[in-house]
Amino acid sequence: MASELKVDKFTGVTTAGSIDVTSGSTTTNLQEGLAKMVINYDQIADSIRSSLNVSSVSDNSTGDFTITFTASKTDINYSPSSSSLAYATSDRIGNFVGVRVTSGSTPNARSVGLFTGSLRINSGYGASASGAGNEADADANCVQTFGDLA
């Protein structure tokens, strides 16, 4: 017999913001598994189609933009995930989008785009007639982050 539970709010007994879910012998924390930021951003039109926990986006240059969070992260050890698609070009295959890393002669001299209040992203061509590795604006930059909020 199927059951249905209708509630407006779940609250943990020992910790209000922490709820464990058990499936078989595996237990996972519900809050830790939820995306804390989600965005579908059109860099060509400079418009946000859909978002969660995003206060703004700055279009820095071709294939380079910064997402500013409404609620900050606790640290820079969160996990971003992304995908990109350029509808407006014939080079639809092989696009990339990921965390921006500036060049430097050593790993310590490089700058990574992970910040507690924002995330800097690059998009471009992975392999195409327009140039492998070239930065380019994409119609659909979909980015999500997982990790604790401050």
Residue ranges and their predicted role:
Residues T89-A150:
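Extracellular jelly-roll beta-sandwich "head" domains, especially the C-terminal globular C1q domain
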